[in-house]
Amino acid sequence: MQIDLKSCSLGMELGSTRIKAVLIDAAHTPLAQGEFTWENRLQNGIWTYPMEEVRQGVQAAYAALAADVRAKHGMALPAVGCIGVSAMMHGYLAFDENWNLLIPFRTWRNTMTAAAAAELTAAFGFNIPQRWSVAHLYQAMLNREPHLEKIAHITTLAGYLHFLLTGVNALGVGDASGMFPIDSATGQYDAAMLKKFNELAAKQGYAFDLRALLPAVLCAGADAGALTETGAKLL
């Protein structure tokens, strides 16, 4: 059965053990799916996934989805109405100004930020779990990690894939709330806590503007960009 692809939505999820791609119609009926199996690995005491496997897995899941569309509906998959990305929250992906990865991806599974989480929780008066991105960043400061000399962006796995597809450095407010506390009144990062973090960073010898490192925060329905030619080639 032929389907109206312009009214369809493509969802991609990068979970702990599978990367999944699902196509649904305007009535939210699943039409086709594809997947890629992967697993995190322990390298030098850190739970991580290689970034090249992110690309390979997304391509494989999309290819399987396209094959399923052809098998079930007898048509190619040249376009869709919209794309949504979901992935493991939290963790730490640090990049330089040209979006080169500075250190291996630190996933939410890592419990290596106890000192940072405790200090930030006390300073903010707000619970900061070890898995949160800001805890990983501050722990890197406490550890005097060399990659901080070049850091220009931090994001999550979903944020990174969104950037690869659209060129837009942004997160939905839900994902963003796993990086840094959100002010419920503004729907943006908490300004007072951002200031406190910058003050703590300065005491550690780092002149950071944390807000400049973080992705933009978008609420549901906001314009999050469009698939670029580079993003389409990735798929």
Task: Name every feature range the model reports, one short phrase each.
Residues Q2, M12-G15, G84-S86:
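Short loop/turn motifs at secondary-structure junctions and domain boundaries
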Residues Q2-I3, V22, A232-K233:
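ATP-binding/phosphotransfer module of carbohydrate and carboxylate kinases, centering on a glycine-rich
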Residues S9, L14-E52, N100-T107:
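Short glycine-rich, Thr/Ser-proximal phosphate-binding strand/loop in the N-terminal lobe
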Residues S9, V54-Q56, S133, H153:
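N-terminal start-of-chain detector that recognizes signal peptides
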Residues K20, G57-A60, T230:
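Residues within well-formed alpha-helices
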Residues G34-M75, E119-G125:
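N-terminal phosphate-binding loop and adjacent alpha-helix
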Residues A63-L235:
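Glycine-rich phosphate-binding/catalytic subdomain of phosphoryl-transfer
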